[in-house]
């Protein structure tokens, strides 16, 4: 890059406070992989071969900022509403931001910028059984279930603020679009809000946290998910196996 372009890129893609976040967030609680959740809770970093700013999440962050600026003054709508979902003993409060909550419709929305292929695979990875979603036992199904748990937790956080929640939606937009138009290219996955799903996710998180801190400070007994890309590529470092609660 030229010096001028290098400076521009450096400034635009500088890490945000969210990028620097080391504590676990609501979006990570539904991860199938208990070992990765334990990593996050204990502050064990994940290393990747890539350096620099990942472009896909950056585009998602940029869209969220744009959506917030366009809609934050709408009546009867909460945009980027902070919610708290639980308080882990000796860890602290875990909170997140709901992209959009329509108070009149009692519906929480979560924007997702995904590839067209991922949206298509998501459609195929879910089936309904007596109005309940069943996710395929695949990598895509695992990721979709993670998103589903995330929005159930957002709904729970909203109820803790006194709001009534009836539905939660994942609104997926194709980030690799070309001639697609809105709204035809948008895919909404709408679910009835279920408190039991949120409470089960919170209880699981507490259980992982308890186990991560037990075993005389060792955490290597916590198992990986067979669907976890990070673990399947053996990206866990020796730091995990040798991690000790006392450092």
Model regions: which residues?
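Metal-dependent nuclease catalytic regions and adjoining charged, substrate-binding loops involved
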Residues: 1, 138-145, 156-247
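A short beta-strand motif that forms part of the nucleic acid-binding face
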Residues: 112-115, 174
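Residues forming well-ordered secondary-structure scaffolds
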Residues: 93-96, 146-149, 153, 200
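Short amphipathic alpha-helical face segments that pack within enzyme cores
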Residues: 62, 66, 149-157
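A short acidic, glycine-rich active-site loop
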Residues: 128-148
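Metal-dependent nuclease catalytic cores that hydrolyze phosphodiester bonds in DNA/RNA
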Residues: 1-108, 115-129
């Amino acid at each position: 890059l030229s010096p001028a372009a290098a400076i521009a890129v450096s400034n635009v893609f500088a890490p945000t406070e969210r990028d620097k976040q080391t504590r676990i967030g609501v979006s990570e609680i539904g991860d199938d992989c208990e070992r990765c959740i334990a990593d996050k809770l204990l502050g064990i970093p994940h290393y990747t071969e890539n350096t620099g700013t990942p472009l896909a999440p950056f585009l998602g962050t940029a869209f969220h900022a744009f959506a917030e600026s366009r809609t934050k003054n709408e009546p009867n709508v909460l945009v980027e509403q902070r919610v708290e979902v639980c308080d882990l003993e000796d860890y602290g409060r875990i909170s997140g931001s709901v992209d959009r909550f329509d108070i009149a419709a009692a519906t929480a929305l979560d924007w997702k910028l995904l590839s067209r292929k991922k949206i298509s695979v998501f459609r195929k990875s879910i089936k309904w059984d007596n109005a309940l979603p069943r996710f395929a036992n695949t990598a895509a199904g695992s990721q979709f279930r993670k998103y589903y748990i995330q929005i159930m937790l957002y709904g729970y956080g909203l109820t803790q603020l006194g709001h009534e929640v009836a539905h939660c939606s994942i609104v997926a937009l194709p980030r690799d679009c070309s001639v697609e138009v809105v709204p035809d290219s948008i895919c909404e996955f709408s679910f009835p809000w279920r408190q039991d799903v949120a409470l089960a996710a919170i209880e699981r998180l507490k259980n992982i946290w308890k186990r991560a801190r037990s075993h005389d400070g060792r955490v290597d007994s916590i198992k990986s998910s067979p669907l976890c890309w990070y673990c399947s590529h053996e990206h866990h470092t020796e730091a995990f196996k040798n991690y000790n609660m006392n450092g």
